[in-house]
Regions:
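A structural motif corresponding to the C-terminal end of an alpha-helix
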Residues: 341-346
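Conserved SGNH/GDSL esterase-like catalytic core that processes O-acyl groups on lipids
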Residues: 33, 63-66, 89, 95-104, ...
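N-terminal secretory targeting modules
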Residues: 20-226, 231-232, 245-248
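Hydrophobic core
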Residues: 4, 8-14
Length: 346
């Protein structure tokens, strides 16, 4: 079944029918956190972050530490790492997960760290360019909803990393294997990216991490917010809080929103374009429909399709110029057709 509700211009809600577990069990994987992975290419707005990682990892070896909240509690977790855009195959020496400690945002609580492994039990592995890798970890006891996780990814080829989500947590990078260290002794928030001009927003790049799922009861599901900068904020968290305050504990609310994202065309502009993501009609499958346990999707998109062609620094990307020969200024009919495309995909 499909329920559509157009609440305002460029906004709609889609409701998917519940899906049974693949193995027929009473539990299934449900997203507790999600990030839309982008290409932080050298010629994008992200060269500072890339060069910082390269300089800190002189030998290519270093640890990414990522702090993210989980919207669902549980014991057994699955984490998806990506290498869609890296400059080559990535070698990962170790991945650990633990609870955030009380001594700062990047600290991990003593005695909570566990090692994540692939489905065949390997703690070290490679991720081919263009591929993903799932790793699994379990805590001795179930952790409560709203817990903050500290994820450590020790990468022996860190200079090749180009996959980053832009929102939903905080990240640091430090030379060497510090996966078991309680605190960072040489704090390097190298994955922070400040806008190069006014109005583009600041980011905290989250490397390699696309999704964290938890094994949950059959009636638990994920809600996805997907769209542009109008929902890269606290709106998903506010909904999550309101649900929990009203006794709803079997639903997560995760975000697939990207600042500057458009419905019909990939990001415009040489510097900011790669960090505005693929057209929503292109990324909808991966960033919404394939999110584990998804049953409800809120879409807020279309404003940038209208506004970007009017901006002096971007207009040439929409007039079929040499900058982007296939760029065009969308009509109302084309935008409506884009919404219909999303409905058809559902």
């Amino acid at each position: 079944s499909l329920l559509l509700c157009f609440a305002m211009l460029c906004s709609m809600a889609l409701s998917l029918a519940p899906q049974a577990s693949a193995d027929g069990s009473s539990e299934h994987w449900v997203a507790a956190w999600h990030g839309s992975v982008l290409n932080a290419a050298e010629d994008s707005q992200a060269p500072k972050a890339i060069s910082s990682i390269s300089s800190l990892a002189a030998s290519g070896r270093g640890t990414f530490r990522i702090q993210v909240p989980t919207q669902l509690g549980g014991k057994d977790f699955r984490m998806t790492l990506t290498n869609y855009y890296g400059t080559g195959s990535l070698s990962v020496g170790k991945v650990t997960a633990g609870l955030q400690g009380s001594e700062g945002l990047s600290g991990q609580a003593s005695g909570t760290t566990v090692t994540a492994k692939t489905s065949n039990g390997k703690s070290s592995f490679s991720i081919a360019k263009g591929a993903t890798q799932d790793v699994f970890f379990s805590f001795p006891n179930a952790i409560p909803e709203g817990s903050s996780l500290i994820i450590n990814i020790y990468c022996t080829s860190a200079k090749k990393v180009r996959d980053f989500a832009l929102t939903g947590g905080s990240a640091w990078f430090q030379y060497g294997d510090i996966t078991s260290d309680k605190n960072l002794n040489a704090l390097g928030n190298a994955a922070n990216l400040v806008s190069i001009n006014n109005g583009e927003g600041d980011y905290n790049l989250l490397p390699l991490l696309q999704e964290i799922d938890v094994k949950a009861s059959a009636d638990t599901y994920a809600t996805v917010f997907i769209g542009d900068s109008t929902i890269t904020n606290s709106i998903p968290n506010i909904l999550q809080d309101n649900l929990q305050k009203n006794g709803v504990h079997n639903a997560s609310v995760v975000s697939s929103a990207i600042k500057g994202n458009e419905l019909l065309q990939d990001g415009a502009g040489k510097l900011q374009g790669p960090l505005e993501g693929a057209a929503l009609t292109t990324r909808f499958q991966m960033d919404a429909l394939e999110v584990a346990g998804v049953q409800k999707i809120f879409v807020k998109i279309g404003a940038n399709d209208i506004l970007h062609p009017l901006l002096p620094d971007l207009k040439e990307w929409f007039d079929g110029s040499n900058t982007r020969p296939d760029g065009y200024v969308p009509t109302a009919e084309q935008i409506i057709g884009g919404y219909q495309n999303l409905i058809d995909q559902v």
